[in-house]
């Protein structure tokens, strides 16, 4: 089984890698922006044209971290990575995207919000808005792409 993990230098990717690294039945393909820039459509197209992937674990992200100064590139980069990967959903069996509580707006208390309320909120920050729009698309697609939060 070939598993593509984007954002190999991030916390989530490192944790997932440590879980799968000793499995003989799993071939991990770990990427960062130097080996596969998911913001670039042509790079993603070339990657899927030349690699057989069973599972995509999309852990690459821009923003969302403490100390990160948010800017408009947060929404552009996050949405372009997601869109470029999802355009090739016919080239893999399943994709997992990592959501965030920020999808519901960081200014809200989200403990009592149900998942179906994602359509009712629009976060005020770039990172949260990007995550919200990705979640909305995943819900509307009802395909082989899933959001983990």
Describe each PLM feature range:
Residues 41-78, 90:
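NAD(P)H-binding glycine-rich loop region in Rossmannoid oxidoreductase-like domains
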Residues 2-23:
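N-terminal Rossmann NAD(P)H-binding glycine-rich loop of SDR-like oxidoreductase domains
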Residues 122-146:
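Active-site Tyr-X1-5-Lys
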Residues 6, 31, 56-62, 95-101, ...:
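SDR active-site strand-loop-helix element
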Residues 14-16, 67-68, 106-109:
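Short glycine-/acidic-enriched loop or helix-start segments at secondary-structure transitions
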Residues 83-124, 146:
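Conserved Rossmann-fold NAD(P)-dependent oxidoreductase catalytic core, especially the SDR/UDP-sugar
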Residues 39, 70-81, 121, 125, ...:
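Glycine-rich NAD(P)-binding loop of the Rossmann-fold in SDR/ketoreductase-type enzymes
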């Amino acid at each position: 089984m070939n598993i593509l993990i984007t954002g190999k230098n991030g916390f989530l990717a490192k944790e997932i890698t440590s879980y799968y690294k000793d499995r003989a039945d799993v071939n991990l393909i770990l990427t960062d922006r130097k080996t596969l820039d998911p913001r670039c459509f042509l790079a993603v197209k070339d990657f899927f044209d030349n690699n057989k992937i069973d599972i995509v674990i999309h852990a690459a992200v821009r923003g969302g971290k403490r100390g990160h100064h948010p800017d408009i590139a947060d929404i552009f980069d996050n949405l372009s990575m997601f869109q470029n990967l999802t355009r090739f959903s016919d080239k893999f069996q399943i994709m997992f995207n990592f959501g965030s509580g920020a999808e519901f707006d960081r200014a809200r208390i989200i403990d009592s919000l149900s998942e179906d309320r994602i359509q009712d909120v629009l976060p005020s920050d770039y990172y949260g808005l990007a995550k919200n729009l990705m979640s909305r698309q995943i819900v509307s697609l009802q395909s082989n792409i899933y959001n983990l939060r």
